[in-house]
Amino acid sequence: MPLGGGLKSVPNGLNPPSIKLVKWNDVFGVEITEKEINRVTAVAEETMAEVIIGIGGGKTLDTAKAVGHHRNIPIIVVPTTASTDAPCSALSIVYKENGKYSHALWYPKNPDVVLVDLDIIIKAPIRFLIAGMGDALATYFEARANQESDSLNYVNYEDGGYKRSQAAMALAELSYKILLEDGLKAKVAAENGVCTTALENVIEANTLLSGLGFENAATAGAHSIANGLTALPENHKTLHGEKVAFGVICQLVIENRPTEELHRVIDFCLSVGLPITLEELQVEATLENIRIIAEESMAYTWSSEPFSVTSNMVYDAIFATDKYVHHYKKSMFT
C-alpha cells in the first residue's frame, strides 16, 4: 500500500502484476500530525494492507513509519529527496496542525527496506539536497556533545537508550568529512542533472550515515534550535535541514568552540547555500522572536550538552550567532 507524496506513479519495481496496490497519493496531507497518522492508519486497516510503502520526502516517510508501526506490518521507504536522515531512522517527528513541533514517536525497529534511487533523487529541486546537508551537518557535532556529556543514545529510546558506540562516532564524523569534501561538488552535479561520485557520497551521508549516526549517538543543541524555530509561523516555509544548519552554528557558539572550526562550518554553509541568519530563515531578528526560539528550544535536547544550558544562554547564543554571521559575511568583501 503506497503512501504517496513524491511521485506521480509507483516505480515499476514496486508494482509487480502479482501484487495488488492500494494507492492513496491524495490522502496524505501537507503536515504529519497525530490526526493525519490516525487517518491514514484507518485507510491501511480498511484495505487490509500487508505492507506500507512510503514514497516521498521526510514527512511522507515518517507517516509511513508511523502507520506501519501501528498496523504492525513491514515498512518500505523510498525517498524522493535527500533532504533529511528520516529514511533510515526508527522514529517519526510529529507536528501540530499549525506546523509547530509536537513530539517524536519512537519505534522498536528501523524500516524493513530503504530504497534510494539516484535517478529519482537528482530530479528533486536542489534545495532539498542542500537542506539534507544541513541536517547531516549536525550529526557529528551533536554526537561529540553527547560523547562529552556521556549521554545515552536513541536506540531502544523508550527504555532509556544505550551508550553510544565508537562505530556511531565514526559514522558521524565520516558524514561531516564527506560534506566538507564533496558537498559543493555534489550541489553542482545535482544542479546540472548528473550523478557523480561526490553526489553519491553526499546522498549516502545525508541518508544512511547521518541516520545511523544521530540514532546511535543522539542529538543536542542544533536540533533544539531547529525545533524552537518551528514556534514562529513565518519560519514554516523553511526546511528542517535549513533550520538545523543555523542550529549547528548556535551550538558551536554556545560551546565556544575554536574560531577555526566555527569558520569552517560557516564557510561550508555559504558554499552550498544554506541559510545561516535569521533573516535568511525568514525570521525577523527581534528580541521577542529570539526569546521565543530560545524558550521553545529548552523543551528538547539541550540536556545532551556537556554543561547545563539555560534559556538565557540560548538567547545570547542565537543573538550572537546572527550578528557574527552578518559580520563574517561583510568581512569577506572588505
Which role does the model predict for each range below?
Residues 44-80:
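A short, small-residue-rich loop immediately preceding and capping a beta-strand
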Residues 69-167:
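A glycine/threonine-rich phosphate-anchoring loop and its flanking beta-alpha core
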Residues 257-334:
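C-terminal charged capping/lid subdomain of soluble metabolic enzymes
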Residues 1-51, 278:
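ATP/NTP phosphate-donor binding region
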